[in-house]
Amino acid sequence: MYIILLFSILLMGLSNVIPQAPQTNLNVMSYNIWNGFDWGKDSLRRKNCIRWIKDKNPDVLALQELTGYNEEKLKADAEKWGHRYVKILKTNGYPVGLTSKKPITVKERVIDELWHGMLYCETYGIDFFVVHLSPADCNLRLKEANIIAQKVKESKSDKFIILGDFNAHSPFDEALLKDNQSLKKKYLKNKSEKYFNLRLGEFDYSVVSTFIALPSIDVSTNFIDLNERHTYPSSVLIGSYRKSFDEVKQTRERIDYILTSPIMAKSCVNVTIYNKGATETFSDHYPIMAEFNFKDEKYR
């Protein structure tokens, strides 16, 4: 018995001396949760979404539309999907936030210059820029993109991820968008005298192009077919903002992204947009998750 006890103590001591191998796999998810589950009133949708996130087990989660949330409330939810650490941009309007299995350091909160704001954090040794760009106007979005792109440049980081709801289209989706008259008509119908989502009546690619020019990599394009990349709208909008499933299908678009630095893109092994099944009922947006493997030391 004494020998067994002594052996156990020695093992415990060695575990504190032997260096732990660095984590080589990292799953990063972004999700717009649609008005913070109706400002917290839709408890069933919230409960089901939390359970789903727990099942997918991301290491880092960026959230948009945390309406009605503060850091304490976000922490309570995040602990249910296994994240001890949380940061939120603000507690009014439409906040963005970040949750993680490892400690998070806030490097900057940008609020006044942007429509919804941007949260710039570091976790897992990676710089995260959580964004939610203006839904109203292509010129406002381009202005925001230039501000955020400058922040990324100033960070001088070679390991960064820009992620969230960009409310903007990618030039890599142009082949699909150019013939989508239903979506174009919807944008034209929603225009006002002050704001325009189309640029001279056409889809605008300048916002996402601004980030690509940093350079950053749109990692979804390497893993997801053009026809399967839509992140909005889901069927949950039928009866309110969409009349039928046919209208949902006709107005599909990709406006949520995970963009990474070139060196991080080298370690990206998969991207999934969860635009089928249970996620039809959680939010008007679909979540996106990128998987990274850093086994190659030169990309760590």
Where are these regions (language model features)?
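Stable alpha-helical elements in mature extracytoplasmic
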Residues: 45-49, 70, 74, 141-144, ...
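Structured beta-strand-rich core segments of catalytic domains in phosphoester-bond hydrolases
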Residues: 63-143
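N-terminal, active-site-proximal structural segment of metallo-dependent hydrolase catalytic domains
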Residues: 2-3, 16-79, 295-300
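Active-site environment of divalent metal-dependent phosphoester hydrolases
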Residues: 35-38, 68-72, 136-138, 168-174, ...
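Metal-dependent phosphoester-hydrolase catalytic domains
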Residues: 109-110, 154-155, 172-300
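Active-site beta-strand/loop signature of hydrolases that rely on acidic residues for catalysis
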Residues: 26-33, 49-70, 128, 148-177, ...
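Sec-dependent N-terminal signal peptides
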Residues: 3-13
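Beta-strand-turn-beta hairpins that frame and shape the catalytic cleft
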Residues: 20-28, 101-105, 115-131, 265, ...
